[in-house]
């Protein structure tokens, strides 16, 4: 997605959610400064084992789709969206790439990163404290912003961790992207909300609107991108 196209989406998102663009850009500036000092990965630095990608979201279908994936006998590039990383590690699946705004179960994201997963860290107006806390614990980081990219930061398109992961796969040259654990419904899991006591719970209105945007953005990519999207 071209930046100018994304910015039209972004303007609507700011209006619908009441987000502060200046806060987004403050967090982005912090992430950029950290990466300039500690190492600035680019897209070309990511080795992908296959042009067939699978993106795991943290929806209710995640566990069943993980079992389906493990039964496959084909190489795929595996991307986990934030909290889905925990479920992958529970099934002994190490993602190649993690896309996160640092509100999943961080000990699992840190462990997967330690084992070799590249972490694509997203800056937005609500996660500056998390950036300060967790960036020093991570390595092999690519930075993203939801505003105008600059310095070490990219903007591939996408709003939530899940659809950003899909847009990242497209930017990495995917020919096929399988969507797994991406339900876009009214139920969330403990992988999406680590503070939740039960396995499943209702999505609040903000979460439902975020998932609606995620679904619409992926639909846009399917219509306009040069990639085949397969929904499990």
From Swiss-Prot:
<keyword id="KW-0067">ATP-binding</keyword>
<protein>
    <recommendedName>
        <fullName>6-hydroxymethyl-7,8-dihydropterin pyrophosphokinase</fullName>
        <ecNumber>2.7.6.3</ecNumber>
    </recommendedName>
</protein>
<dbReference type="GO" id="GO:2001118">
    <property type="term" value="P:tetrahydromethanopterin biosynthetic process"/>
</dbReference>
<comment type="function">
    <text>Catalyzes the transfer of diphosphate from ATP to 6-hydroxymethyl-7,8-dihydropterin (6-HMD), leading to 6-hydroxymethyl-7,8-dihydropterin diphosphate (6-HMDP).</text>
</comment>
<dbReference type="InterPro" id="IPR002826">
    <property type="entry name" value="MptE-like"/>
</dbReference>
<dbReference type="Pfam" id="PF01973">
    <property type="entry name" value="MptE-like"/>
</dbReference>
<dbReference type="GO" id="GO:0004788">
    <property type="term" value="F:thiamine diphosphokinase activity"/>
</dbReference>
<dbReference type="GO" id="GO:0009229">
    <property type="term" value="P:thiamine diphosphate biosynthetic process"/>
</dbReference>
<keyword id="KW-0418">Kinase</keyword>
<dbReference type="InterPro" id="IPR027510">
    <property type="entry name" value="HMPDK_MptE"/>
</dbReference>
<keyword id="KW-0808">Transferase</keyword>
<comment type="pathway">
    <text>Cofactor biosynthesis; 5,6,7,8-tetrahydromethanopterin biosynthesis.</text>
</comment>
<keyword id="KW-0460">Magnesium</keyword>
<dbReference type="InterPro" id="IPR036759">
    <property type="entry name" value="TPK_catalytic_sf"/>
</dbReference>
<dbReference type="GO" id="GO:0003848">
    <property type="term" value="F:2-amino-4-hydroxy-6-hydroxymethyldihydropteridine diphosphokinase activity"/>
</dbReference>
<keyword id="KW-0547">Nucleotide-binding</keyword>
<dbReference type="GO" id="GO:0005524">
    <property type="term" value="F:ATP binding"/>
</dbReference>
<comment type="similarity">
    <text>Belongs to the archaeal 6-HMPDK family.</text>
</comment>
<dbReference type="GO" id="GO:0016301">
    <property type="term" value="F:kinase activity"/>
</dbReference>
<dbReference type="GO" id="GO:0000287">
    <property type="term" value="F:magnesium ion binding"/>
</dbReference>
């Amino acid at each position: 997605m071209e930046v100018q196209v994304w910015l039209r989406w972004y303007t609507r998102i700011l209006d619908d959610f009441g987000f502060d663009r200046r806060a987004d850009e403050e967090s982005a500036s912090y992430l950029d400064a950290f990466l300039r000092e500690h190492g600035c990965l680019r897209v070309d630095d990511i080795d992908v084992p296959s042009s067939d990608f699978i993106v795991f979201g943290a929806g209710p279908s995640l566990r069943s789709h993980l079992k389906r994936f493990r039964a496959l006998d084909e190489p795929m590039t595996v991307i986990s969206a934030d909290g889905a990383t925990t479920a992958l590690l529970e099934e002994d699946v190490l993602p190649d790439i993690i896309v996160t705004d640092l509100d999943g179960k961080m000990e699992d994201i840190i462990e997967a990163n330690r084992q070799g997963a590249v972490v694509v860290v997203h800056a937005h107006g609500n996660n500056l404290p998390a950036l300060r806390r967790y960036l020093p614990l991570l390595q092999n980081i690519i930075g993203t912003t939801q505003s105008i990219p600059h310095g070490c930061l990219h903007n591939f398109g996408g709003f939530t961790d899940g659809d950003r992961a899909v847009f990242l796969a497209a930017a990495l040259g995917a020919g096929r992207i399988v969507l797994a654990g991406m339900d876009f419904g009214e139920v969330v899991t403990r992988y999406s909300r680590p503070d939740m006591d039960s396995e499943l719970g209702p999505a609040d209105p903000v979460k439902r609107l975020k998932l609606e945007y995620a679904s619409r953005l992926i639909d846009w990519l399917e219509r306009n991108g040069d990639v085949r999207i397969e929904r499990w």
